[in-house]
Amino acid sequence: MVRASAGTEKTVIAINLLAELTNRMQFVQYVSKNAAPRTVYQFKLKGHLRKNSVDNLFKGSGSYTEAPRNSVGTLLADEAHRLNEKSGMFQNIGENQIKEIIHAAACSVFFIDESQRVTLSDIGSGAEIEKGAALEKSEIIKMQLVSQFRCNGSDGYLAWLDQALEIRETANYDLDGIDYDIRICDSPAEMESIVVQKNRARNRARILAGYCWNWPKATRNNTNFHDIEIGDYSISWNLNGGDAFAISEESIHEAGCIHTSQGLEFDYTGVIIGDDMRFENGKVITDYTKRAKTDNSLKGIKTLAKKDKEKVEQIADEIIKNTYRTLMTRGMKGCYVYCTDAALAQYFKKLLKQK
């Protein structure tokens, strides 16, 4: 179990392990809940290897519901905090993805960052991995990655962000001396203009947004339909399912969400913070009722709220803040933010000493 916060290059290590162990003739697979990173790596490799060979290196986390014990040499579970209990489209297959991965592999490696759990169905935690290991009678070795490579190598930016989003108390009340370009934009058009300009160098800048706008099935491949509307500004959610969002040159004029960006990194990102987070009475407030109806990350929360409203609001608050923390840490060199809530924008500007 490898604990690693955002930017510690856990995915780079996982991919290098995949290459090294494959070179040693071991049967090894890279596993993730999120399809987006797998799609990117498959796309990059398919010019060099046969399609079947590449596809067999990368698997979804629900691939091991019936796998025999130790049938794989090593499974590298990236973004293990995103693992679910059940598998399948309707989450009704299998028993527990953590236990199934441990069962299927002689050696399983879980890369985990609990602060990136972003849906109600995410069960990946240190406690759950230990529980799965105990059930499978497996030895567990714990490690931690501490060096920060994203956000210009600045742990200070991550600590500042935790303080700003009121995720946890840190000593980082400002970004003095930290080499990271973060700006609050006065309009989404201004934010998009900066990101498009930054993208010209290497096709490594993207716009991301909180899931506060619906993504209707009927228009998901319609380039002329703009799902996100803010005043006279509009933009489409990522097209074609969004799995190639990070590498398709056309996607610079689309907005990605947590599901198409988690596990990936860019040089620069533009982030639209929607109505699910605002600043009110001196506090950063979240509101899960402002999430889009097509967003499944909080599916079932209204039913849970009838049983324990206070606990549900606490869980939703954590998920929403984790989501924006994740979106705001995808950029290695900079992040440009637009907030639909004017008070939240002013709050961030004050923290950044931005006029």
Residue ranges and their predicted role:
Residues 23-50, 60-68:
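AAA+/P-loop NTPase substrate/partner-engagement loops
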Residues 47-104, 253-256, 323:
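Conserved RecA-like ASCE ATPase "motif II neighborhood" in helicase/translocase motors
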Residues 109, 254-355:
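C-terminal accessory regions
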Residues 6:
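The conserved Walker
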Residues 14, 119-124, 136-159, 166-285:
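Conserved helicase/translocase motor-coupling segment
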Residues 10-11:
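Conserved lysine of the Walker
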Residues 76-145:
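Signature of the SF2 helicase/ATPase Hel1-core->accessory helical subdomain module
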Residues 2:
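Hydrophobic anchor at the beta1->P-loop junction of P-loop NTPases
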